[in-house]
């Protein structure tokens, strides 16, 4: 059902508040950061099978205002963090997180598209808000395919949900993202990705890797405080990963820099020792 009037909305709300559901947001412009675009439609599939499309910004529909969608039922979505930027709901479980906690891999559904999506994105690649002109039924086709993957994942890995990560970590990252980073040319937005092979979040968007800005070529200079006479303060742990491992195995480092200590063990300089430690941590083994 496409919800386009008060009667249909009332019917939807009644069903939505009585049953767990899959929730998939469709932004107006998928190429923009979620903070910089609006919600075009919201696809909701109840776990019993009923489907609803709520249109807010689409050329084919009678658009409605975003209703109050808070309820006690569970909502499963692919990206809770992204959903937070469009609409804040209670009891939302990130299915990508479920899968990652069980397999150390991320679900890959970004490439799921219909022929219509491919056509519009190639033909009108310069146009903003392309999702508002892609036919609603094609969005429905795409969402059904995504929903099937999400439901299968929930059935298989539901016990792997880590509520601290699901609630606190994802919501805090949403908050950090929506505040953006002040630069000399305005505010830019980043996007955190928890689902890396090492478990160390990455942070990039629009071709910029914010977690690895070069320290020597001036790449960091445009980033400034948003406050008058403000400053940016960077804090870092000395040998954080090495210290975590040492704590786990009961090893005690001496006072001082961990990397300087490891440099002496390796018989190399500080910078090389730091690089070697990370390589050993993440899969490089010494040749015998």
Kindly give the residue locations of the regions a language model identified.
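Conserved DEDDh/DEDDy metal-dependent 3′-5′ exonuclease domain
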Residues: 2-10, 16-154, 239
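Helical catalytic core of nucleic-acid polymerases
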Residues: 84-164, 169-179, 183, 209, ...
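Acidic, glycine-rich two-metal-ion catalytic cores of nucleic acid-processing enzymes
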Residues: 2, 18, 24-50, 56-60, ...
């Amino acid at each position: 059902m496409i919800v386009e009037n008060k009667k249909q909305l009332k019917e939807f709300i009644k069903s939505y508040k009585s049953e767990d559901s899959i929730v998939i947001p469709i932004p107006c412009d998928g190429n923009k950061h979620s903070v910089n675009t609006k919600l075009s439609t919201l696809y909701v599939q109840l776990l019993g099978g009923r489907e609803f499309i709520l249109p807010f910004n689409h050329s084919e529909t009678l658009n409605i205002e975003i209703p109050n969608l808070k309820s006690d039922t569970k909502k499963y979505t692919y990206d809770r963090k992204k959903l937070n930027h469009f609409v804040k709901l209670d009891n939302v479980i990130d299915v990508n997180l479920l899968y990652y906690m069980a397999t150390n891999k991320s679900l890959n559904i970004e490439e799921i598209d219909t022929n219509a999506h491919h056509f519009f994105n190639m033909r009108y690649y310069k146009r903003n808000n392309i999702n508002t002109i892609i036919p609603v039924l094609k969005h429905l086709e795409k969402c059904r395919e995504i929903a099937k993957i999400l439901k299968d994942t929930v059935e298989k890995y539901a016990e792997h949900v880590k509520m601290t990560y699901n609630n606190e970590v994802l919501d805090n990252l949403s908050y950090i993202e929506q505040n953006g980073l002040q630069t000399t040319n305005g505010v830019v937005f980043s996007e955190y990705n928890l689902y890396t092979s090492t478990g160390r979040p990455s942070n990039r968007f629009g071709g910029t890797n914010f977690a690895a800005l070069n320290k020597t070529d001036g790449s960091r200079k445009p980033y400034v405080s948003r406050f008058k006479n403000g400053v940016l303060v960077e804090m870092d742990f000395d040998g954080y990963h090495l210290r975590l491992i040492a704590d786990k195995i009961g090893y005690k480092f001496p006072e001082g820099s961990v990397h300087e200590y490891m440099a002496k063990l390796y018989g190399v300089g500080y910078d090389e020792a730091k690089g070697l430690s990370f390589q050993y941590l993440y899969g490089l083994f010494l040749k015998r």
